[in-house]
Amino acid sequence: MRKAVRRAAAALTAGVLIALGSSAPVLAQGAWEAPAAEKAKKNPAPADAATVAQGKKVAEVNCVSCHGAKGKGDGAAAVALNPKPADWTSKKVQSESDGEIFWKLSTGRGAMPSWKFLPENDRWALVRYIRTLAAK
């Protein structure tokens, strides 16, 4: 009898740990807020066609598989992701500061990788490109 109770308790404990472990990434998502100092950062990249073209190239090489060709979060890999990739054309993304977007793509979270290995000027150019996608 004791052996059966111990087995049941062990099975229940294992089940709870597995459930908590598999749901932890989802529970950890919550609001994704950049620190105030990061939100306040200004984009040093020029707001010109060359910078936007540079940012578009960065997106095509690194981001399209998840965010899609038009930045709507509908890339081929997005089907398997939860939460879904951000829609760069959305009011939510477009209302974020340049510093906040830069911080998010530099830091990453969950399925969103950190792009810190990309040169800083490429990441700022990507922010400039994302800005061109508003309401498209």
Residue map of PLM features:
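Extracytoplasmic electron-transfer domains, predominantly the class I c-type cytochrome c fold
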Residues: N82-A134
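Electrostatic cytochrome c docking/interface patches
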Residues: G30-V58
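Bacterial N-terminal signal peptides that target proteins for export
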Residues: R2-L12
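Short sequence/structural segments immediately N-terminal
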Residues: V58, L133-K136
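Sec/Tat signal peptide C-region and signal peptidase I cleavage site
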Residues: S22-A28
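Sequence/structural segment immediately N-terminal to covalent heme-attachment motifs in c-type
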Residues: A49-K72, A78, G99-T107
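Short glycine/proline- and charge-enriched loop/turn segments
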Residues: A36-K42, A80-D87
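Bacterial N-terminal signal peptides
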Residues: A11-G21
